[in-house]
């Protein structure tokens, strides 16, 4: 099929009504499988450290668990769009208690803010704009930011900088009630498995370090150094991710971000098919596709052009 005109692309330009229905359809089985995979991977990493405690297994657990904590955020993002399950109630319950609360995120607030992000991507009204600006940075400044993530400094500043009085005590309690309950449950479970030190080592430490790092890398990669235009092929980036990148940086197809912005109603596990569809329709030259996460980080420390695949 010849390439589409050089103008913003819509779902109707790409899909028939039958294809739209197929791409839009969520699956309870697939949604449950993804949540079970995230928590199963976390459990396996915890078991590795408990059975063979050492600096090496702890480091591996921190990386694996920190990445799956980002994975929980990715799955929470799916529930924010009502895409993880066909049931709205199930999306909200699972999104709140099994995805958002364990990593100290409020699903209701995220859903409200994230829909604004989609309406105003890379525009002044975009609430996520500060996450990908100002870029590019000098190598020392970006290295310092990444070191702050790995050292736990970023997490500490976020915790210390949170002020209940900004929103009032009652709203603040509503925001942190679910995270407190979820983490109390995690503390109890991990304490029963390996003693009270297991929670700080196997949950808080990954969250305070590797999770912060991969979250920053994700934010830079998805929208950093891109123009403020109303075209998801140009204001959002997809990143090629091999097996290693998917294991430690980009879980659950989060690297297909352009495809998500273009067809926001498509569940994450179908985004790879959307990517293939765009290439078949000769849209590849118009798409912002980076060769790797390393390539995007390299671009973030230079004034060079886009890190295209």
Regions found by a protein language model. Name each.
Residues 64-65, 69, 204-213:
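Small-residue-enriched core segments of transmembrane alpha-helices in multipass membrane transport
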Residues 67, 150-156, 244-254:
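Long helical/loop segments within the catalytic core of UDP-sugar-dependent glycosyltransferases
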Residues 72-81, 110-122, 218-225, 250-266:
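Histidine-centered catalytic micro-motifs
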Residues 45, 80, 84-85, 230, ...:
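Active-site-flanking alpha-helical
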Residues 213-246:
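Membrane-interfacial segments at transmembrane helix termini in multi-pass membrane proteins
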Residues 1-66, 75, 100-202, 268-309:
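Non-catalytic, topology-defining segments of multipass membrane proteins
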Residues 78-94, 125-132:
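Aspartate-rich (DDxxD/NDxxD/DxxxD) Mg2+/diphosphate-binding motifs
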């Amino acid at each position: 099929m010849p390439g589409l005109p050089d103008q913003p692309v819509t779902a109707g330009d790409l899909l028939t009504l039958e294809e739209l229905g197929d791409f839009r359809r969520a699956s309870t089985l697939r949604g449950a499988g993804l949540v079970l995979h995230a928590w199963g991977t976390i459990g396996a990493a915890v078991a590795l450290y408990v059975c063979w405690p050492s600096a090496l297994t702890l480091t591996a657990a921190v990386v694996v668990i920190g990445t799956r904590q980002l994975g929980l955020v990715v799955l929470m993002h799916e529930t924010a769009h009502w895409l993880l399950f066909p049931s709205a109630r199930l999306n909200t319950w699972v999104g709140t208690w099994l995805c958002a609360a364990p990593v100290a995120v409020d699903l209701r607030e995220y859903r409200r803010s994230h829909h604004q992000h989609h309406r105003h991507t890379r525009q002044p009204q975009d609430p996520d704009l500060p996450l990908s600006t100002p870029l590019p940075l000098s190598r020392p400044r970006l290295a310092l930011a990444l070191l702050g993530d790995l050292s736990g400094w970023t997490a500490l500043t976020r915790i210390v900088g949170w002020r209940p009085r900004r929103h009032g005590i009652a709203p603040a309690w509503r925001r942190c009630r679910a995270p407190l309950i979820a983490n109390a449950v995690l503390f109890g479970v991990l304490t029963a498995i390996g003693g009270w030190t297991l929670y700080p080592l196997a949950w808080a430490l990954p969250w305070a370090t590797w999770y912060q790092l991969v979250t920053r890398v994700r934010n830079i990669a998805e929208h950093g150094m891109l123009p403020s235009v109303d075209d998801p092929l140009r204001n959002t980036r997809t990143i090629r991710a091999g097996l290693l990148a998917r294991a430690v940086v980009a879980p659950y197809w989060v690297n297909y971000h352009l495809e998500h912005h273009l067809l926001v109603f498509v569940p994450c596990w179908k985004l790879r098919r959307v990517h293939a569809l765009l290439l078949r329709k000769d849209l590849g030259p118009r798409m912002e596709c980076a060769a790797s996460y390393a390539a995007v980080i390299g671009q973030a420390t230079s004034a060079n052009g886009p890190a295209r695949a």
